[in-house]
């Protein structure tokens, strides 16, 4: 045992020192990647706290606030039209208990006159525009605006249609593939490998594990965006579990694991933009930028724009 310790302890010490050294200097092992665009202000569902989610009116409002990114979810209609909709089932959005895929685009119902803001419980958005929009409409209206397109399920036809639209409108570098599932992301990458990738849940866990094991400086990272929930919002505006105690436990553990300046700085220097969602209060904006986040995704782009304009360069510290 003593002989094992004699060799193991120096080896572990050397490994730890090397890991810390390269964690702080990733450019010595990896070629820095210059971003095509940077996300400071991302509009969740087009800014669903100010106007009805995913409508053209909401998108226009977000762009008036100089949003850097429109965060979208897409579904496929029966006649193979890619529409911007968070839910597959239309009941919450319109009151009609039908799936998007069971209707042609022209038969899709209007949104309700008001919709509750998911990450601001008790708050409702209204708007004069209640029509669902096609993804192609947004590509035509905002040809050079970066967008994140999240795929919820394993709908290969939807993935192919989106990949084709991105190519047709020459948006390969400014349209991000997003999905929670690695199996779905694999299909997205195969359909259009030129589009930048965001982390899936399992890949995010792998990065955290690698960071705490000291492996992160030595492994390749193909993703360019790390979209992550801010632990501060758990049990306040975000309730992943029905049990309050579990939510509180997750808030404490995830805050300890994720809110690390050295982790975020390393990812940034590797060309990975760290963007926290879905933050709707100034205290949360402050929490995200204080640990060095690239940007924030919000339901209230006007509030975030006001914060960024008032804080200037100080909104991002490292």
Swiss-Prot record:
<dbReference type="GO" id="GO:0070062">
    <property type="term" value="C:extracellular exosome"/>
</dbReference>
<keyword id="KW-0812">Transmembrane</keyword>
<dbReference type="GO" id="GO:0046475">
    <property type="term" value="P:glycerophospholipid catabolic process"/>
</dbReference>
<keyword id="KW-0256">Endoplasmic reticulum</keyword>
<dbReference type="GO" id="GO:0034638">
    <property type="term" value="P:phosphatidylcholine catabolic process"/>
</dbReference>
<feature type="domain" description="GP-PDE">
    <location>
        <begin position="39"/>
        <end position="308"/>
    </location>
</feature>
<feature type="topological domain" description="Cytoplasmic">
    <location>
        <begin position="1"/>
        <end position="2"/>
    </location>
</feature>
<feature type="transmembrane region" description="Helical">
    <location>
        <begin position="199"/>
        <end position="221"/>
    </location>
</feature>
<dbReference type="GO" id="GO:0008081">
    <property type="term" value="F:phosphoric diester hydrolase activity"/>
</dbReference>
<dbReference type="GO" id="GO:0046872">
    <property type="term" value="F:metal ion binding"/>
</dbReference>
<dbReference type="InterPro" id="IPR052271">
    <property type="entry name" value="GDPD-Related"/>
</dbReference>
<keyword id="KW-0378">Hydrolase</keyword>
<protein>
    <recommendedName>
        <fullName>Lysophospholipase D GDPD3</fullName>
        <ecNumber>3.1.4.-</ecNumber>
    </recommendedName>
</protein>
<comment type="function">
    <text>Hydrolyzes lysoglycerophospholipids to produce lysophosphatidic acid (LPA) and the corresponding amines. Shows a preference for 1-O-alkyl-sn-glycero-3-phosphocholine (lyso-PAF), lysophosphatidylcholine (lyso-PC) and N-acylethanolamine lysophospholipids. Does not display glycerophosphodiester phosphodiesterase activity, since it cannot hydrolyze either glycerophosphoinositol or glycerophosphocholine.</text>
</comment>
<feature type="binding site">
    <location>
        <position position="73"/>
    </location>
    <ligand>
        <name>a divalent metal cation</name>
    </ligand>
</feature>
<feature type="binding site">
    <location>
        <position position="71"/>
    </location>
    <ligand>
        <name>a divalent metal cation</name>
    </ligand>
</feature>
<dbReference type="InterPro" id="IPR030395">
    <property type="entry name" value="GP_PDE_dom"/>
</dbReference>
<feature type="topological domain" description="Extracellular">
    <location>
        <begin position="24"/>
        <end position="198"/>
    </location>
</feature>
<keyword id="KW-0963">Cytoplasm</keyword>
<dbReference type="GO" id="GO:0005783">
    <property type="term" value="C:endoplasmic reticulum"/>
</dbReference>
<feature type="topological domain" description="Cytoplasmic">
    <location>
        <begin position="222"/>
        <end position="318"/>
    </location>
</feature>
<keyword id="KW-0472">Membrane</keyword>
<keyword id="KW-1133">Transmembrane helix</keyword>
<keyword id="KW-0443">Lipid metabolism</keyword>
<dbReference type="GO" id="GO:0070291">
    <property type="term" value="P:N-acylethanolamine metabolic process"/>
</dbReference>
<dbReference type="Pfam" id="PF03009">
    <property type="entry name" value="GDPD"/>
</dbReference>
<dbReference type="GO" id="GO:0005789">
    <property type="term" value="C:endoplasmic reticulum membrane"/>
</dbReference>
<feature type="binding site">
    <location>
        <position position="86"/>
    </location>
    <ligand>
        <name>a divalent metal cation</name>
    </ligand>
</feature>
<keyword id="KW-0479">Metal-binding</keyword>
<dbReference type="GO" id="GO:0048471">
    <property type="term" value="C:perinuclear region of cytoplasm"/>
</dbReference>
<feature type="transmembrane region" description="Helical">
    <location>
        <begin position="3"/>
        <end position="23"/>
    </location>
</feature>
<dbReference type="GO" id="GO:0004622">
    <property type="term" value="F:lysophospholipase activity"/>
</dbReference>
<dbReference type="InterPro" id="IPR017946">
    <property type="entry name" value="PLC-like_Pdiesterase_TIM-brl"/>
</dbReference>
<comment type="similarity">
    <text>Belongs to the glycerophosphoryl diester phosphodiesterase family.</text>
</comment>
